[in-house]
């Protein structure tokens, strides 16, 4: 059962441990996994608890107390548009995070053993701003093999 925080603001201090498969920071509050959009691994943050379920918590980033060395300032219009999910991360670290997000998804949803041997390093784009693309590739396992369709 999902519950909102009943109008009460509860701000908590979290250390972010890793990036989730949707690009959100993951920390733990009272041993419960807590997702915080905009937070990065190794950061100490203050977040407001906005939703809690029996399995997880969603927090809203209030303040970064100890920023990641990979955090970069972004233009205000980027942060407001919602189109730049990892724009607050240095580009080199974005490439690493994106590969790790894919590896985590393969491991979590497809139980592919050692997927790191199947996924090459993320290729850098010559253009890192002012373009927009989105690719989605449906994947499935059939007869023990991964298949992709478009």
Please identify what each model-predicted range represents.
Residues 1-150:
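SAM-dependent transferase fold signal centered on methyltransferase-like domains
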């Amino acid at each position: 059962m999902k519950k909102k925080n009943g109008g009460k603001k509860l701000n908590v201090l979290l250390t972010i441990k890793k990036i989730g498969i949707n690009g959100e920071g993951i920390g733990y509050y009272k041993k419960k996994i807590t997702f915080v959009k905009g937070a990065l691994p190794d950061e100490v943050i203050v977040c407001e608890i906005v939703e809690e379920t029996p399995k997880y918590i969603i927090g809203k980033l209030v303040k970064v107390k100890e920023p990641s060395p990979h955090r970069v300032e972004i233009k205000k219009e980027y942060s407001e548009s919602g189109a730049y999910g990892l724009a607050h991360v240095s580009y080199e670290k974005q490439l690493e995070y994106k590969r790790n997000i894919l590896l985590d998804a393969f491991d979590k949803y497809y139980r592919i053993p050692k997927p790191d041997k199947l996924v090459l390093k993320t290729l850098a784009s010559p253009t890192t701003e002012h373009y927009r693309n989105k690719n989605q590739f449906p994947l499935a396992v059939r007869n023990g093999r991964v298949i992709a369709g478009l």
